Swiss-Prot record:
GO terms for cellular component: cytoplasm. This is Carbamoyl phosphate synthase large chain. It catalyses: hydrogencarbonate + L-glutamine + 2 ATP + H2O = carbamoyl phosphate + L-glutamate + 2 ADP + phosphate + 2 H(+). Residues 133-327, 671-861 form the ATP-grasp domain. The gene is carB. Mg(2+) 2 binds at E298, N300. Residues 547-929 are annotated as: Carbamoyl phosphate synthetic domain. NCBIfam families: CPSaseII_lrg (TIGR01369), PRK05294.1 (NF003671), PRK12815.1 (NF009455). It is an enzyme of class 6 (ligase).
Length: 1072
């Protein structure tokens, strides 16, 4: 059936900010879909709130709206643009929920808009647990015995009937939000209460736990002619019970017999047909390892995290084809873009093994509960490809960016058998490493299988790796053993340690003995047809399929998995850099390992290598390609950290030299440079011992800011107010020694300013200056940023511009630089300089229209700023106000403190833009998920040091009609200022207390600042967590609170009696 001609304009709904459960995979799928629809001649309008993505570039769609994804704003866009149809299935759960909300509000009917891809009835049948259960029963498809509940009482009734354990799955949520496995009444009460709150329809499915079954996923496609295919099937190494986003996954499935494979394939196709989905769909199934009994777990009637993985694993571009199917094209009409010969109705075939390992944020959140269950906790993932499972797994392990090069962790060697058993049964982020350790210590595969029901096939593969370790250790210098180890995926780093040599020595030994990898192509058809895609993975074998061309080439290093501190912003910069390299006439080669991102779409670069970002893996590519050089500026800290080792190997680092990178990162060299340039900075020194640290802090004076050198995302940074806190930090947060010094700075309570600039060594161009709402001390990634600055005097702005130009030239920067300043007592100080792309590059590029990564790349390749039409100086400011607001995933991470500080905690960001600061803030806050009601109650419990400041805030809340609630201490201070307040009991009170108010939804805001000391700190933590669990906005910075007040005040009409007005006027006369 040819494409539809009765529709012209299509509104695509994006997925909004990156949160746990919904990450960069939707930037990839959304970008693909918009391009795919435009190829077919449709006018595409995009709405998304996330400025950090390629998807929200103006070139992606005919019109791009960066606006909150709420009913209010999307309805406005529909009324203004009058699209013929909307496509919500590429915007993740956000897109689906938005479609349902729009349909129910009546706007779609009012404006004559139809839903493409997945019909509303199919969305509801798949997402509403009750309707889905009914459909499965009609199809005679087995599902675990279950019930739908809307109250806690109903949950208790069901458990009486079938007993524990039970799984709770809230309706219309993603990433398992609010769900979990309950083994007793206490867990049931906690998880069901939370699940009902998180479900927008207050509905949960309670089902008998089938934990321990194999978890299998099928990624299926169907068109309007009822052609349906399986694109890829995947198997979770972790059995049912761990969310698939937190599971280690392999593709294709490894342990299914043909009968099992066909049985589950038929079920998946039967389900997509019954739902009538036109496009992509993900079916999750559980299979009893001891029989042919299977269960349908759930269906995602949309493009998902798994479809991004399936696309990259097979090369089959699911989102691109799903968009074409949505407008009426059929699988037998669409050419497969990979082979450019076969049609899209051919099911992909794989002649390799793909492994995906999640990347968790536990290195950031030491206190988080690491146990894995049905609620997702990973922020991102890595993927690797190999010719055997061992090779594929070990390549994935070293892609994780945890400084780990093998399936072993030093700290696990101390574990006794009982501890290992507990952790393997319970499942946490280190389970696979613990399984390997258990096998090293002689625990049998049978015992491990009994503990966690992991399939013997996977346990055998881990045992093969452990046996190979023994071979390597027993045969030092044996090249045959080395060849076998490399075929199994062992790294030079591991072999070097086992043979007591350096990594470089092993590398040289291999080259001499000709033990080097070859590169194979990902072609969707197991080499049955000739393929046109330059998409490669390394393995050890005979024939190399990646042929070097005669063109000059440049290698760009990507940023690896999405994690806190290094998000999709760096992928954005990487993609723009690749485009600029191509425009400049070079061959662009990209190395990256993140299956979710646009940069690993094979159509972006001239060559894509899906490989770990380690020195060994990158050097193999450089040895083959012999590029002009490597660009490390756009891959975040991942790429910067490889610069020195690459240079040791004789590789040319393009852009800012290694020496100058080091001058910006090394504390003493940086201080010397600033002194030479005459630029002030907060007093600070470097400590290499605990005693030194104590002496420096005494000399500078508390409070001080302490942090390790060379970090991204403020890892292990803290503001310390007295010596006990400093000693606690030195003992727990860092291992200080000569090679890893700790930086100690005077902490200045001032306004923080952030600047991004581009330098060619001679000229320095500044696209934008941003002002942070939160004062210095809150990480820049967690602050609300405002452009253009709203409260900077011209004099201060000039100082900032002068310092930026001096730093760009003085540090010999070639490419991008990001500078953070603090304004303290009308003086500008430099806090830090990052000689690389920062997380604000996409935001400022979109606002100013200066394609920063593109311009910087051309500078790096030798085209100076003047040639490109830019010179030295500050880009004219825009008239509108733009706000960048952070988005957090605290609801997914139990026991993480939500207090903001110098350590970054946000996972994503949104943008709000309008004519005034208040309106832009309103949009930014609403887009980030903060509800802003014009009236209600606010709970105020603040630290003593903040009481004075909190008085003015409380007064303003009272002025606009808010009811104030406070515990005794704060209430007394308020009463002394004649501010009406209602006293509430502290949380340790047996009577109705502060936590009860939060749980019952009787407060709209909670203002709580961090109090140091044991009990108050614990109380504050419980108040903050309770707020998150109950969806109440908890404000831990008084600056953020002031910003929200500005918005509330701008929305509220004043209500003063005439007497108050005349008194105010009389008061003014007296003062005059």
């Amino acid at each position: 059936m040819p494409k539809r001609l009765d529709i012209n304009t299509i509104l695509v709904i994006g997925s909004g900010p990156i949160v746990i459960g919904q990450a960069a995979e939707f930037d990839y799928s959304g970008t693909q879909a918009c391009q795919s629809l435009r190829e077919e001649g449709y006018k595409v309008i995009l709405v998304n709130s996330n400025p950090a993505t390629i998807m929200t570039d103006t070139a992606t769609a005919d019109k791009v709206y960066i606006e909150p994804l709420t009913l209010e704003f999307v309805s406005r866009i529909i009324r203004k643009e009058r699209p013929d149809a909307i496509l919500p299935t590429l915007g993740g759960q956000t897109g689906l929920n938005m479609a349902v909300e729009l349909a129910k509000s009546g706007i779609l009917e009012e404006c004559g808009v139809e839903i493409l891809g997945t019909k509303l009835s199919a969305i509801e049948q798949a997402e509403d647990r009750d309707l889905f259960r009914t459909l499965m029963q009609e199809l005679n498809e087995p599902i675990p015995s279950s019930t739908i509940i809307h109250t806690l009482e109903e949950a208790h009734e069901f458990v009486k009937e079938i007993g524990y354990p039970v799984i709770v799955r809230p309706a219309f949520t993603m990433g398992g939000t609010g769900g979990g496995i309950c083994s007793n009444e206490e867990e049931l009460i906690e998880i069901v209460s939370g699940g009902l709150k998180h479900s927008p329809v207050t509905q949960c499915l309670l089902e008998k736990s089938i934990a321990g079954c194999k978890e299998i996923e099928y990624e299926v496609m169907r068109d309007s002619n009822d052609n349906a295919i399986v694109v890829c099937n995947m198997e979770n190494i972790d059995p049912v019970g761990v969310h698939t986003g937190d599971s280690i996954v392999v593709a294709p499935s490894q342990t299914l017999s043909d009968r099992e494979y066909q049985m589950l394939r038929n079920t998946s196709l039967r389900i997509i047909r019954a739902l009538g989905i036109e496009g992509g769909c993900n079916v999750q199934l559980a299979l009893d390892p001891h029989s042919f009994q299977y269960y349908v777990i759930e269906v995602n009637p949309r493009v998902s995290r798994s479809s991004a993985l399936a696309s990259k694993a097979t090369g089959y571009p699911i989102a691109k084809l799903a968009a074409k199917i949505a407008v009426g094209l059929t699988l037998d009409e669409i050419i497969n873009p990979v082979t450019q010969k076969t049609y899209a109705c051919f099911e992909p075939a794989l002649d390799y093994v793909v492994s995906k390992i999640p990347r968790w944020p536990f290195d950031k959140f030491e206190s988080a509960n690491r146990t894995l269950g049905t609620q997702m906790k990973a922020t991102g993932e890595v993927m690797s490809i190999g010719r055997n499972l061992e090779q594929s797994l070990l390549k994935a392990v070293r892609s994780l960016e945890l400084g780990v090069y093998h399936l072993e962790l030093e700290h696990l060697k101390e574990l006794d058998k009982e501890t290992m058993k507990k952790r393997i049964i319970k499942a946490d982020d280190e389970r696979l490493f613990i399984v390997a350790e258990a096998i090293r210590q002689g625990v049998t595969k049978e015992e491990i299988n009994e503990w966690c029901e992991m399939d013997f096939f996977f346990l055998q593969k881990v045992e093969n790796i452990v046996n190979m370790e023994r071979e390597v250790k027993a045969n030092v210098g044996n090249m045959e053993v080395l060849q076998t180890a490399k075929e199994m995926g062992f790294s030079d780093h591991y072999v070097a340690a086992a043979w007591n040599k350096t990594e470089r020595e092993i590398y040289d030994m291999r080259k001499e003995s000709n033990i080097t990898p070859v590169y194979k192509m990902v072609d969707t058809c197991a080499a049955e047809f000739e393929s046109a895609t330059p998409y490669y993975y390394s393995t050890y074998g005979d024939e190399n399929e990646s042929v070097r061309t005669d063109r000059k080439s440049v290698v760009v290093l990507g940023s690896g998995p999405i994690r806190i501190g290094q998000g999709v912003e760096f992928d954005y910069a990487t993609v723009h850099s690749v485009w600029a390299i191509k425009e400049a006439g070079y061959e662009a080669i990209i190395v990256n390992n993140n299956p979710e991102t646009v940069s690993t779409d094979f159509s972006i670069s001239d060559k894509l290598y899906f490989e770990p970002l380690t020195i060994e893996d990158v050097m193999h590519i450089i040895d083959l390609e012999k590029p002009e050089g490597v660009i490390v500026q756009f891959g975040g800290q991942t790429a910067i950290n490889l610069a020195a080792k690459l240079e040791e190997h004789g590789v040319k680092i393009l852009g800012t030299s290694l020496e100058d990178l080091d001058r910006a990162e090394d504390r003493d060299k940086f201080e010397a440079a600033l002194t030479q340039l005459g630029i002030p900075q907060p007093v600070g020194k470097t400590a290499t011992t605990v005693e030194q640290a104590v002496a420096i802090a005494e000399e500078i004076g508390y409070p001080v800011l302490v942090r390790p050198s060379y970090v991204l995302g403020g890892r292990a940074m803290e503001i310390v107010y007295r010596q006990e806190e400093l000693l606690h930090y030195m003992k727990n947060a860092v291992k200080v020694h000569a090679e890893h010094p700790v930086l100690i700075d005077r902490y200045m309570v001032g306004k923080e300013i952030e600047v991004d600039a581009i330098s060619d060594g001679e000229n320095v161009f500044i696209p934008g200056i941003m002002e942070h709402i939160e004062r210095a001390g809150v990480h820049s990634g967690d602050s609300i940023g405002v452009y253009p600055p709203q409260s900077l005097s011209e004099k201060l702005k000039e100082q900032i511009i002068e310092h930026t130009i001096a730093l760009g030239k003085g540090l010999n920067i070639v490419g991008l630089l990001n500078i953070q300043f603090v304004v303290f007592k009308d003086q500008v100080y430099v806090i830090e300089v990052n000689p690389r792309a920062s997380r604000t590059v996409p935001f400022l590029s979109k606002i100013t229209g200066v394609p920063m990564a593109n311009v910087a790349t051309k500078v790096i390749l030798g085209q100076d700023l003047v040639e490109q039409g830019y010179g030295t100086g500050y880009h004219p400011e825009e008239k509108e106000v733009y706000v960048k607001a952070p988005v957090f995933s605290f609801a997914k991470l139990r026991s993480v403190d939500t207090t903001l500080g110098p350590e970054m905690k946000s996972t994503g960001e949104v943008m709000g833009k309008d004519l005034t600061l208040e309106k832009a803030l309103y949009k930014g806050l609403v887009a980030s998920g903060i509800n802003i009601p014009t009236h209600g109650s606010v709970i105020i419990t603040v630290a003593d040091k903040d009481k004075e400041e909190a008085m003015e805030i409380a007064k303003r809340f009272h002025e606009i009609g808010y009811n104030l609630l406070a515990t005794a201490g704060t209430a007394q201070s308020l009463a002394e200022q004649n501010i009406p307040v209602q006293v509430v009991n502290k949380i340790d009170s047996e009577d109705y207390n502060l936590l009860d108010i939060i749980r019952q939804g009787k407060a709209q805001f909670v203002i709580n600042t961090l109090t140091k000391g044991k009990q108050p700190a614990r109380d504050g933590f419980r108040i903050r967590r309770e707020s998150v669990e109950n969806g109440v906005a908890c404000l831990t910075s008084l600056d953020t609170t002031r910003a929200i007040l500005r918005v509330l005040e701008s929305m509220t009409f004043s209500a003063h009696s005439m007497k108050e007005i005349t008194q105010t006027k009389r008061h003014e006369v007296v003062h005059a």
